[in-house]
């Protein structure tokens, strides 16, 4: 692990010479915590401190995805919930919003963020475990690394680095450790919809997980991201979302059509960057929710616009991860869109970033035409049957319990043949839950240090309990933080 830049930090949470010069006010915008963490996409991309140090946008995007993959691997090996992994990723995104990649090793900072996230989410892991596993992942191509980190001198050096890094991260974040994720609003909304709940929740969940690799959490509020994930998941599964009654479905999220369109487009961009040609005649064999590839994009509009909503069909294929192909979006009825209940398309940001122009939504993907929700249902049924007598003893559950149970265990779809797996090796890891984590060890040698192969890694779905999160932003011992900072600079 490399060193950490500390000279640009201040105890107010503002980096000297940072483009984000607004004083850090935890209670900006009517007392809403964390309001200062939202910026427009243009601000994030053009004012990055990394850009000033010679790191272009493409390189920075690669580094962002790299530490996200590293954190996913680290979190699974530490056996922490997906919510903890997501919190660590958000901490990392926020850190590099105010610090440069050129002056801070991404994997060292990521390790610190995982250690910190474990405590924030009340799923702490021993510092020793975090250090050992992180070191092994970083030096996975070095057979001697496992034994080297067990040497007292090497271990103490890494321990000191992580503890130093923790102070730097806390100072850079302004001791604001409060993070909210899209998972809760996503599940609550789907419970209200009562349409294909299990499959829709799982696919949308996968979109949220993959969206962590982008800067969406720095632009949009959690419920806006949840709306975008449900929008894409419904298109992938060809599920009709509620469009009658007092509200159309997207109004449940207090999101405008412009915000919904922008979130959806940015999620799709993630898959376009891993574009590969879809395999011929594999429509039925590779169905599922999966992060794979996007072929092309055409134009369209989000719900509530004057034109017909998008029908993203050229988006991904196989594996249960997150990027599904989309077809047959059932949008709100025109009369609903023109009624007084329609959300006006204004430029109000509401704490999110909206650009005047942005990529349009996509349409028709040949590889996804044969995908339907029956395949997903069949996969669920197959998994239940595979559990044998144990499954037969499970009591009948209500819809809410079933959704949460399915999200915990994931939806296992039909496996691809080796050829298809190979063609998708460069895409984002599978997003389904894996209970035993043993597959994590099977990393391919051609992946970048700290990154995973699609065939060897899967996501864990967050645990949907009602555990009350501690409000970590209060009383974080500011005096100690200032004292530590002075020691670092002395």
Swiss-Prot record:
Residues 367-391, 457-490 have a biased composition (Basic and acidic residues). Keywords: Cell cycle, Cell division, Cyclin. GO terms for cellular component: cyclin/CDK positive transcription elongation factor complex; nucleus. The lineage of its organism: Eukaryota, Viridiplantae, Streptophyta, Embryophyta, Tracheophyta. Residues 282-298, 352-365 have a biased composition (Polar residues). GO terms for biological process: cell division; positive regulation of DNA-templated transcription, elongation; positive regulation of transcription by RNA polymerase II. SMART domains: CYCLIN. GO terms for molecular function: cyclin-dependent protein serine/threonine kinase activator activity. Signal peptide: none annotated. It holds the Pfam family Cyclin_N. This is Cyclin-T1-3. Residues 275-391, 414-490 are annotated as: Disordered. The gene is CYCT1-3. InterPro entries: Cyclin-like_dom (IPR013763), Cyclin-like_sf (IPR036915), Cyclin/Ssn8 (IPR043198), Cyclin_N (IPR006671). It comes from Oryza sativa subsp. japonica (Rice). Belongs to the cyclin family. Cyclin T subfamily. The keyword Cell cycle applies. The keyword Metal-binding does not apply.
